[in-house]
């Protein structure tokens, strides 16, 4: 599985390079965001060797390392550079919109607010502003608890409220 993953990664890298070279030559301003939406399906033994311990002994920090996926935002014009950014996939849309100079829609404004206190989250937990991972429900501050609760409601509304009227009523922005 590891060899297969590395071979597929090489093919993806080559395809991305081809795409970038094409758009480098285009006059129309273009931004490309490429990311993996999940960790690779590699043998647990590989990760155990990498981390130096059995999976049953992993803490939340080590579990999160298995779910980390790289991303890149590239443009054929100058954009702000950032390296070694730790965010979750749900925040990439905002990063992309801001790089493109697009005003954040209502939904994204709340996502931006959440990201200021919770820079990363996934099915396993969330990262605080100090880069420490926490399980959901483990001694969350009232602020974090409220943000997560409202985010859950908003996310449900975003995907189920086709004309977004409920969201507009719930979240009034100035």
Residue ranges of predicted features:
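Solvent-exposed soluble domains appended to multi-pass membrane proteins
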Residues: 1-174
């Amino acid at each position: 599985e590891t060899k297969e993953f590395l071979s597929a990664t090489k093919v993806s890298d080559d395809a991305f390079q081809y795409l970038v070279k094409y758009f480098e030559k285009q006059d129309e301003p273009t931004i490309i965001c490429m990311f993996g939406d999940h960790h690779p399906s590699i043998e647990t033994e590989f990760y155990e060797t990498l981390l130096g311990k059995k999976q049953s002994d992993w803490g939340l920090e080590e579990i999160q390392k298995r779910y980390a996926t790289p991303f890149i935002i590239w443009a054929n014009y100058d954009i702000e550079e950032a390296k070694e950014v730790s965010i979750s996939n749900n925040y990439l849309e905002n990063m992309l919109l801001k790089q493109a100079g697009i005003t954040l829609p209502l939904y994204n404004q709340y996502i931006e607010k959440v990201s200021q206190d919770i820079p990363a989250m996934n099915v396993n937990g969330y990262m605080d502003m100090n880069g420490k991972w926490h399980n959901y429900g483990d001694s969350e501050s009232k602020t974090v608890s409220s943000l997560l609760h409202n985010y859950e409601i908003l996310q449900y509304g975003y995907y189920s409220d086709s004309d977004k009227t409920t969201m507009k009523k719930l979240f009034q922005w100035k």
